[in-house]
């Protein structure tokens, strides 16, 4: 007599498989979307590269700007304290990015949330807007400045870019360029500025009228404190150094 083997019910698929399948489909959609976005961005960058001007004339543009506004070209080495304060505040990864800093761009919205200025635009982008976009900040100008920033980074050495930036910036009170600003505010050449003076000067870059040390000393001191905080953040100064510098007089001569 043949024994009847008990048939086992068919094994059902794990309940998690449909979930995994949905997750896999979602990943594919996301990856395809990101891939498509990357292609569009690269295409837009290629078009931007073709339609924006070359930047071999950047130094001539700086010289023309200084001549138009009565500024003075800087001489000698880039002032060490001014450069350190500027880079800590405006572009702490200068020299290690190709003219655009995606980390900085991602930090900028975070700064709005936490109530601190964490940067965003690089030195090259800011210089591009001043020299080639007449300071415009509309979306088109910002997009072009990204392409121009990469061109500037490829065409010029870091020291040249810093010098052009410091010569092109407006520091308020009719002072165009770091040479005129240092002599106008403090009666000193840029290389002889102390930390207190250099940090006040760099604080003017983003809003020279708002942080005017003559008209708004309290706001200028608050901005100086931010510059000092950034110097501490990047390791140039200790917290004790920053506190001592914040207490130093500025010795303003303009007014």
Predicted regions and their residues:
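Juxtamembrane regions of bacterial inner-membrane/periplasmic proteins
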Residues: 1-255
